[in-house]
Amino acid sequence: MPVDQEKLAKLHKLSAANKVGGTRRKINKKGNLYNNNDKDNTKLQAELHKLHPMTIENVAEANFFKKNGKVLHFNSAVVQIAPQCNLTMIHGQPKENTLNGLYPSVASQLGSQELEYLTGLAHNLENEQTVLDQLGDRCSETKQQVMNS
């Protein structure tokens, strides 16, 4: 049976004008506007409570030294320990600082061994930084040579 193209085009035009069904618009899903991890935090607190930690009182500040030379500094931190699990917990909002920035305020609170260790760590970081700077200079020189040739 032959199909008349004019009638078919006319039917397509009419069917486009008379759509059946509702509009299929997307419903905008709003994400969590306040990204708080209270659910995860309560689970974590429940698990930590099972360890029966002891709270250490009167801790004014705590510092956590990283290998990359950064220091996590906690003001008015809550420190808990669970000696049976060899676990120490520090609760609070940390600020990430450099070792050189905290060194003057921390130096008076440290013993001789810790002071020597931090001094050595600071010197190692400075040496690494100078080596990285030298490598960066060499790389920029080679890039310029390649571009010039």
From Swiss-Prot:
Which Gene Ontology biological process is one annotated for this entry?
A: 'de novo' cotranslational protein folding
Using the UniProt record, give the first listed, main subcellular location.
cytoplasm
Limits of the NAC-A/B domain: 38-103
Q: Which UniProt keywords apply?
A: Cytoplasm, Nucleus, Protein transport, Transcription, Transcription regulation, Transport
**Subcellular location per the Swiss-Prot or TrEMBL entry:** Cytoplasm; Nucleus
Q: Which family does it belong to?
A: Belongs to the NAC-beta family.
Q: Give the function comment from the record.
A: Acts as a component of the nascent polypeptide-associated complex (NAC), which promotes mitochondrial protein import by enhancing productive ribosome interactions with the outer mitochondrial membrane. Also blocks the inappropriate interaction of ribosomes translating non-secretory nascent polypeptides with translocation sites in the membrane of the endoplasmic reticulum. BTT1 may act as a transcription factor that exert a negative effect on the expression of several genes that are transcribed by RNA polymerase II.
Protein name in UniProt: Nascent polypeptide-associated complex subunit beta-2
**Which organism's genome codes for this protein?**
Saccharomyces cerevisiae (strain ATCC 204508 / S288c)
Taxonomic path: Eukaryota, Fungi, Dikarya, Ascomycota, Saccharomycotina
